[in-house]
Design a protein with these regions (language model features):
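Conformational coupling and interaction surfaces
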Residues: 75-76, 80-188
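Active-site histidine-anchored catalytic micro-motif
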Residues: 2-108
Length: 188
């Protein structure tokens, strides 16, 4: 969906509907919502149904390192949505850029482990090889030489592996127009 026009107007989407539907189900199991891009769907769901805040935990791949912040792809796609979510009481496990960039993989490993996995594996690997030859790829922060950063993978990893990771609980900042973090004292 397009970015929120402001911090009070939701953008209708199938993703927002799904989040609301799942969060409002009567179920004793915890609900984790993994967000591998902008927070538009989650913010829209919250603006439409604020009761979801106490019924899920969001795991978001996005934002720059603390305490300063700065430009980052997922955050930059919808700053208003980040401020809606950070201004809510919703639990958020944020995985910022300095953490998700720690998931590099070599082209050789992708060729060994992904390419042999049938038509889909071959397609994914071939697409990556073709993209790696473009000028955009050579300028990408997600590629360094013969390796790529698989930045979205920490989200499922947080759920699949035992919780033996190091983390910090910090007050949610307000995100400014230049994507830096500001402590305003109003967020949780």
């Amino acid at each position: 969906p397009p970015a929120l026009p402001d911090a009070a107007t939701p953008v209708p989407s199938e993703g927002a509907k799904l989040i609301i539907r799942e969060a409002m189900k009567e179920d004793t199991r915890p609900l984790f919502v993994l967000l591998l891009g902008p927070l538009t769907d989650l913010a829209s769901a919250y603006l439409q149904e604020p009761r979801i805040a106490g019924r899920l935990t969001a795991i978001w791949i996005g934002g720059a390192p603390y305490p300063v912040g700065g430009p980052e792809f997922n955050l930059g796609n919808d700053v208003n949505a980040v401020n809606v979510v950070f201004g809510s009481t919703m639990p958020v496990w944020q995985v910022p850029k300095n953490v998700y960039e720690m998931m590099p993989v070599s082209m050789a490993e992708l060729e060994y482990r992904v390419r042999p996995q049938g038509a889909v594996g071959r397609y994914l690997f071939d697409q990556l090889v073709a993209y790696s030859q473009t000028p955009e790829s050579r300028a990408s922060a997600f590629r360094t030489g013969e390796s790529w950063v698989l930045g979205d993978n920490p989200a499922p990893g947080l759920l699949l592996y035992e919780h033996r990771f190091q983390f910090d609980w910090v007050p949610a900042p307000y995100v400014t127009a230049d994507q830096t973090y500001a402590a305003i004292g109003r967020n949780r």
